[in-house]
Amino acid sequence: MKLEFHHINYVSKDVDALHKFYVDILKMDDIAPQNFPRTDATDKTGYAGHIKFATEGSMQMHLAEQDFDVAARNGRHINPVERGHIAFRTNDIEAFKAHLSANGIEYADYGTAFAAEWHQIFFYDPEGNIIEVHQQVV
């Protein structure tokens, strides 16, 4: 099972202003949102918040509109767009879930509720920081 760093997610009440800061001040490149196909959110599943993306070439930043109700709306116990998170990509999400379970770490499996091409799970580190691990499913 391979694991590699993928992105940092920051949440904001003003995604456009945050994105402008990273692009204009830190000179990061914009990543077009069509590179990240999303699922359609409903009143019971998914996430319809505003998202923008930036990169310095190797690492991505996902800048998302803060939403305190995502976990409840999706029937999960971890909310990845309340405070933000760091993310890793794996080539075997099922093996990684088994690894977490074997170590007594609970996780929230969002499947493809947020991103049409990623199976995402979220869990907490010992300090309460949210970590995402996803596998590309296309």
Language-model segments: which ranges?
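Hydrophobic side chains in well-ordered alpha-helices
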Residues: 18-21, 96-100
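Short glycine-aromatic motifs
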Residues: 2-3, 28
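Core segments of cupin and vicinal oxygen chelate
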Residues: 11-59
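A short acidic-to-branched-hydrophobic micro-motif
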Residues: 61-65
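Vicinal oxygen chelate
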Residues: 1, 5-13, 49-57, 73-138
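A short, acidic/glycine-rich surface segment
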Residues: 37-42, 69-74, 109
